[in-house]
Amino acid sequence: MNRLYLKGCGTALVTPFTDDYKVDYKAYAASVDRQVESGVHFLVPLATTGETPTLSAREKTELLRITRERVGGMPLLAGCGTNSLDGTLANMELLEPFGPDAWLVVVPYYNKPTQEGQYRYFRAVAERSTLPIVIYNVPGRTGANMEASTAIRLAEDCPNIIGIKEASGRYDQVSELIRRAPEGFSVLSGDDDMTLALMATGGQGVISVASNVAPAEVSAMCDALLKDDLKTARTLHHRLFPLFKGCFAESNPVPVKAAMARLGLMTGKVRLPLSEATASTVELMNKIIDDLWKSA
């Protein structure tokens, strides 16, 4: 297995829906093209931002097929994690023929596994996977945090666990991960507003929600950080910060879809149990978008 090294800006792609809540594959393909043309470093279909729990098997495979077809050799990190080993392995079997380069596997949700349970689960997934794996730690959604020591243990024991998307919001934990991570293990921010801090202290990149809206700008910030150009990175961070915060004014991806609608790229429709952005969120995102382009 070739060692994949993820760095820079990876966009967690939204899934556009039509007014009658069907997947808008045309808008999705255009969105993927926009990402590629804007210089993002890798793409992440079928994750949280893509409303993947609401998608059918056919929709998932078609979205991944379209993505692979349009990105050439750009790395694709596809979401496949569930809260059971069998469910995650079944997703891998379903999706692998459609060209992912690696899997994004979330810490199992609802079950609230212990650190030992998390370790055994990810080790079992890694042993059965033919592709590299990136752990996704997002305790605000799963109810269980993966501690730095568990992630390091997995990185050392499982050669095909190549990184972690860290969305715990705990900089002390992420800093420990960065300090102890083995060479070639990517620590990626799962929170746009923490990207500057993480990359400035040795993290490799971000899996971004905001880059759906501003792919060139978020990619440029990551490029600057990879070159240790903190002055440029700080300027971009401060320009983008209202967008970073606004994207979480309501549950992701509700606000980012409102922003994409403002740009005319897709509708703001989301599938139940999510509901469309409130009037105040639409107003907020409209202002953020207008101000962002004014400040260019």
Specify the residue positions occupied by each region the protein language model found.
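Active-site beta->alpha loop and helix N-cap motifs at the rims of alpha/beta catalytic domains
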Residues: N2-G143, R153
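Gly/Ser/Thr-rich helix-start
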Residues: C9, T48-E51, C80-T82, I164, ...
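Structured C-terminal cap/extension of enzyme domains
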Residues: V23, V36, A197-A296
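A general structural signal for well-ordered alpha-helical segments in protein cores
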Residues: Y28, K60, L64, T88, ...
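Catalytic alpha/beta core domains of metabolic enzymes, predominantly
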Residues: E127-R128, R141-F248
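Glycine-rich phosphate-binding "P-loop"
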Residues: N137-V138, N160-I161, R271-L272
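Short, well-ordered beta-to-alpha junction loops that form the rim of enzyme active sites
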Residues: V138, A167, A259
